[in-house]
Amino acid sequence: MKMNPQDLVAMKGCKRIAMLTAYTCPIARSIEEAGIPVILVGDTVGMVEMGFDTTRDVTIEHMEYHVGAVRRGAKNTHIIGDLPFGTDVDPQTALINATRLIEAGADSVKLEGPNTRVIEHLVDHDIPVVGHTGLLPQTAKTFKQVGRTAAEANRIALEAQAIEKAGAFMIVLEHIPHALAGEITKALSVPTIGIGAGADCDGQVLVINDALGLGDYWPPFSKQYAYVSKTVLKVAREFSEEVESMKFPSNIIQFTGTDKN
C-alpha cells in the first residue's frame, strides 16, 4: 500500500525509513517488490545515467520522463520527484514545474536549499514537499563535507528548522557531520533522511547505481551491495566471444511461433 506524507511522518521515532533512487521501470519494479517504501527520482540521473558532469544539465523534461518510467514500474510506492536546477527560482515557476512532476507520476517533490517562499507556495497548492539541506549538489562548487565549522553547522541547523516551518514533511541531510545530523534530527518533528550524514537520521537514501556498484565512481559514504559493472563487462565479453566463435545462437535451441491471424 502506497504511503502518503502523513504515514512517513508517523514513522519518525518508530521505524527507520529506507529510500532508494530509481530512474527506470525495471529497477523501480524490483525496489517496490523488495518493500522499499519510498523511491526518489533524483536529478542524479544526469550524472549516473546520462553522462553529464553535473546535475545542473538536467531539465524538467528529463525528470518527467524518468518519473513516468518509475511510476509505471512502482505503482504502489511513494515517489519523490526532484525539481532540477533552475526550475524553482520563484514560487510560481516552481509550482508550474512541480505540477508537471506530479502529473508525470510523482507523489511529492524535492527541492534543494532553504527556499521557504517556494516551499510554502507549493504546500499551499497541495503539493507535498521534501526539503534538502547540507551539501547542495545543484549549487555546490565541491562535494566536500559541509557543516564542519560552528558557523556553518548553525546555518544548516537553522535552514532545516526553516524548511520544516515552511511545510516540508521530510528533509534530506546530505554529507554533514554525523553529530550535527543527529542534533538536527532530534530538533525536528519531521523525518530526516541521511545521505552521508550518519546513522542518527530517521532514514537513509542511497543512489541505486552506487548500491549496485554500477559505474566507475561511488561516493565514499555510499555502500556497494554488488558490483554490477563487472557483471555487465563479463556478459558483454562472453557474448562477443560466442558470436565470434558461432556458439551463439545455438542451433540446438529453436524458437517456433504460431501465426494466430
Q: Residue spans of the language-model regions?
A:
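Alpha/beta enzyme core
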Residues: 2-226, 230-261
